[in-house]
Regions:
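Short alpha-helical segments enriched in small residues
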Residues: 11-195
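Short beta-strand-to-loop capping motifs
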Residues: 4-10
Length: 195
């Protein structure tokens, strides 16, 4: 996250803002100066969408960041912390055989987590994360710092992504929550179905 501060008279500020939006408009949070979590809440609220979270390695940090925003109850109703495999199965419906075959930190598991959260919550967008925060855990194929993300959208399928953040636990959790929130900004307003 980068903060840009513009200083000058009103005309210079408007010109600077226009130039900034021209150069990096897709990456600028609205309203200008908003935190990422506030931008997510305002964005979802503006579209009339509800969100849910299914978290493993972040231990509820994504949900915490969303609910730190006043008015977030208008967009956020459900969050699961499913640290253990049993919780992923019992609470989100992740098939035990998928966990056994692929392990908790895998694309099939995180996809099932997001889709389970979407189904159980009735939300429009659900984000799920599962990773090895470290310093322990991980394998040679999936070392500490490996994390899988999934964003399930009621009107647009599920998107998955794997990232590697070799950091201390707290930095890892912050980076994962940041990426998870950014992905929620891809939610789109449901389209009317016509026959």
């Amino acid at each position: 996250e980068v903060d840009v501060r513009l200083v000058g008279n009103e005309v210079a500020l408007k010109q600077g803002e226009a130039r900034l939006l021209t150069l990096a408009g897709a990456y600028v949070l609205r309203p200008l100066g908003a935190t990422l979590e506030r931008a997510v809440v305002l964005y979802l609220k503006g579209l009339g969408l509800k969100a849910a979270t299914a978290e493993s390695c972040t231990g509820g940090l994504i949900a915490k960041r969303i609910t730190d925003v006043p008015g977030s109850s208008g967009v956020f109703e459900f969050g699961w912390v499913t640290y253990a495999d049993r919780a992923k199965t019992e609470m989100l419906g992740v098939p035990a055989e998928v966990l056994e075959e692929h392990g908790a930190v895998s694309e099939p598991v995180v996809k099932a987590m997001a889709e389970g959260a979407l189904e159980r919550s009735g939300a429009d967008v659900a984000v799920a994360v599962s990773g090895f925060a470290g310093p322990d855990g991980g394998t040679p194929e999936k070392p500490a710092g490996t994390v899988w993300f999934a964003w399930a959208f009621r009107n647009g399928g599920t998107v998955t992504e794997m990232m590697f953040y070799p950091r201390d636990r707290e930095s890892f959790r912050q980076m994962v929550s940041q990426k998870a929130l950014i992905g929620m900004l891809a939610a789109r307003k449901p389209q009317a179905v016509t026959e």
